[in-house]
């Protein structure tokens, strides 16, 4: 045996206490002291520059359809602009192309919106001979407001109403990949189509509905053929534990087991098969196969009718609409809303996407297996996803496609009017965005996310823009507030704004978005605290939306914005200075401290 090595035993060490936290920066000192994390909030050259030069964006968003009755005459537009300016805002974001693909200006390319109505609300109309964008541009120029025009890039229809040019042009629509499930019953020939979405009445009558919520069974059976409905109850292994007529469901003594489900047929043929072959004790299973469907055939999937970014005609159309506006109207900037993305991880799986991806990786691919395969946990029908060998390459490829489209947009805009700014709006919870292909961070942002490999990192688009707005849509203002209430600290304006600023990483200006609808049952002080946190963590504030009881909150804005500030994206050379300082720090080998990865709420700002 070799001689034992001498063992080094641990010894006590001494560690000095951390420095006392520095006093927080308060963009609105009149609102009073707020417990803010200045060490992390003040990070970066963009923050330092904005504070030193007294730069702060103050942007009011005007949603097209929600405000249609407020901007459908020249006089109304004048009143709206005056109200916003009088409250201290210095920029207006006006939506010219909403998700429907119908525009709010006189276009030679896109149809003009005529009216809009939600259930239970009066119809809002737009006179055919009135151009709201022209009136908005005129008033913003006259009243000294920076006008930024909003476009929903890859949306050409409203699925709640079936309106928009994407319906007349189905070839534009995003193609979704789905796994079509089939219920397998021993000794029954073939199988029965199974609904993909649990606890919903399927659109197709021949599909077997799946419920984990017994109340939904009771609610849905009367809606369609209750006399022919048949119900079987299965446990978590898929074994039938009960069966009954739909009309007798309410009196069934067997409850849905934990992890189990009720399967409901409402067509005569399917009900007969279940009755004959799915007896108590029989174990059922599910098989699935991939199908590819245009999003217009899935109206429950999401409200916007998303289009296919891999199609040249779709990209060209969007660029042509933007060029038409930049060329024809006196505007200060353009911004893409949150539809500069794909429909989800399930889209786009069109032939164009397959061809472009094969060119990207340089070989044929098994479609969709090399990328991913969806599946289901039977009987609850929870969707599963298994990555394929090219999954990481697929995420990079999708993000690269959108990044390059944004670069095309910047070139298009600047070639017409170099002074017009280009920006993007996104939700603040960055880990949502690989699924939809939008890498809104800087191309040198590093953080501990599985998807953020060196290739994906390079697809970051922040540096292409003049500013990035992130939806920090929370009502809890500060991290300290969340700690005191026992809440998740990531679901705060401060954490969202702080992370957004770190992700953009001096590549552009960062503005924090606040959603007024979230404050419906809150107090003016709650909104003041949110504005304070937004202004302390980023270089500006965007307020969404003018339709959200705006007049109720106007006194808060008047108080907040009474001290003038310069708009960062209009400050000569300031962003260039920020970028130069950042580049010099990198060249000197200075390594930034790790970004704090707060757990935000999925879907925030979408």
Where do the model's predicted regions map?
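Active-site mouth loops of central-metabolism enzymes
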Residues: 62-76, 303-317, 446-448, 517-525
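Mature N-terminal, pre-catalytic/accessory segment of carbohydrate-active enzymes
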Residues: 2-94, 138, 183-260, 267-270, ...
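Polysaccharide-binding and catalytic clefts of secreted carbohydrate-active enzymes
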Residues: 83, 169, 174-193, 246, ...
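Catalytic domains of carbohydrate-active enzymes, especially glycoside hydrolases
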Residues: 75-102, 328-332, 458-470, 537-541
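Hydrophobic faces of well-ordered beta-strands that scaffold small-molecule active sites
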Residues: 58-62, 92-94, 147-149, 334-336, ...
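Aromatic-lined carbohydrate-binding/catalytic grooves of carbohydrate-active enzymes
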Residues: 89-128
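Glycine-rich, aromatic-flanked loop segments that form ligand/cofactor-binding clefts
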Residues: 35-48, 89-100, 132-197, 226-229, ...
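Substrate-binding cleft of secreted/luminal carbohydrate-active enzymes
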Residues: 455-605
């Amino acid at each position: 045996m070799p001689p034992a090595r001498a063992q080094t035993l641990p010894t006590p060490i001494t560690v000095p206490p951390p420095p006392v936290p520095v006093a927080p920066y308060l963009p609105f000192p009149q609102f009073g002291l707020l417990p803010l994390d200045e060490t992390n909030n003040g990070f970066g050259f963009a923050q330092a520059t904005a504070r030193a030069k007294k730069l702060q964006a103050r942007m009011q968003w005007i949603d097209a359809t929600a405000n249609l009755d407020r901007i459908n005459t020249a006089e109304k537009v004048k009143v709206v602009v005056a109200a916003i300016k009088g409250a201290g805002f210095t920029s207006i974001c006006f939506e010219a192309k909403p998700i429907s693909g119908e525009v709010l200006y006189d276009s030679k390319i896109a149809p003009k919106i005529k009216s809009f109505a939600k259930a239970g609300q009066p119809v809002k109309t737009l006179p055919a001979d009135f151009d709201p964008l022209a009136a908005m541009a005129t008033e913003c120029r006259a009243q000294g407001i920076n006008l930024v025009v909003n476009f929903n890039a890859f949306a050409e229809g409203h699925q709640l109403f079936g309106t928009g040019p994407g319906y007349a042009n189905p070839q534009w629509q995003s193609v979704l990949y789905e796994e079509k499930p089939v219920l397998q019953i021993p000794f029954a020939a073939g199988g029965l189509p199974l609904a993909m979405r649990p606890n919903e009445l399927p659109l197709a009558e021949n599909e077997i509905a799946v419920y984990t919520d017994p109340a939904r069974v009771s609610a849905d059976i009367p809606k369609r053929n209750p006399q022919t409905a048949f119900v079987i109850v299965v446990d978590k292994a898929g074994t039938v534990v009960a069966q009954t007529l739909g009309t007798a469901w309410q009196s069934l003594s067997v409850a849905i087991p934990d992890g189990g489900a009720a399967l409901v047929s409402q067509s005569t043929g399917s009900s007969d098969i279940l009755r004959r072959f799915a007896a108590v004790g029989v174990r059922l299973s599910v098989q699935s196969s991939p199908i590819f469907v245009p999003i217009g055939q899935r109206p429950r999937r999401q409200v916007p009718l998303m289009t296919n970014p891999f199609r040249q005609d779709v990209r060209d159309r969007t660029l042509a609409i933007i060029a038409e506006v930049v060329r024809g109207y006196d505007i200060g900037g353009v911004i893409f809303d949150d539809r500069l993305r794909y429909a989800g991880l399930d889209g786009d799986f069109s032939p164009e996407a397959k061809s472009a991806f094969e060119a990207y990786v340089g070989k044929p691919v098994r479609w969709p297996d090399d990328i991913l395969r969806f599946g289901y946990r039977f009987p609850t029908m929870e969707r599963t996803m298994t990555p394929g060998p090219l999954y990481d390459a697929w995420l990079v490829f999708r993000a690269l496609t959108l990044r390059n489209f944004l670069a095309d947009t910047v070139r298009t805009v600047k070639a017409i009017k170099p002074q017009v700014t280009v920006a993007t709006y996104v939700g603040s919870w960055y880990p949502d965005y690989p699924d939809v292909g939008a890498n809104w961070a800087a191309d040198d942002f590093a953080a501990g996310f599985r998807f953020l490999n060196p290739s994906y990192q390079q697809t970051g688009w922040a540096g292409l823009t003049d500013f990035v707005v992130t939806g920090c849509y929370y009502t809890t203002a500060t991290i300290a507030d969340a700690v005191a209430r026992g809440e998740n600290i990531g679901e705060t304006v401060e954490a969202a704004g702080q992370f957004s600023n770190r992700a953009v990483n001096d590549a552009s200006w960062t503005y924090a978005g606040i959603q007024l609808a979230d404050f419906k049952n809150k107090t003016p002080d709650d909104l003041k605290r949110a504005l304070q946190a937004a202004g302390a963590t980023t270089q500006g504030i965007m307020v969404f939306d003018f339709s959200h009881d705006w007049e109720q909150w106007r006194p808060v804005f008047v108080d907040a914005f009474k001290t003038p500030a310069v708009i960062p994206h209009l400050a000569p050379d300031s962003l260039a200075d920020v970028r130069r300082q950042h580049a010099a720090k990198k060249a000197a080998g200075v390594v930034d401290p790790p970004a704090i990865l707060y757990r935000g709420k999925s879907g925030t700002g979408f």
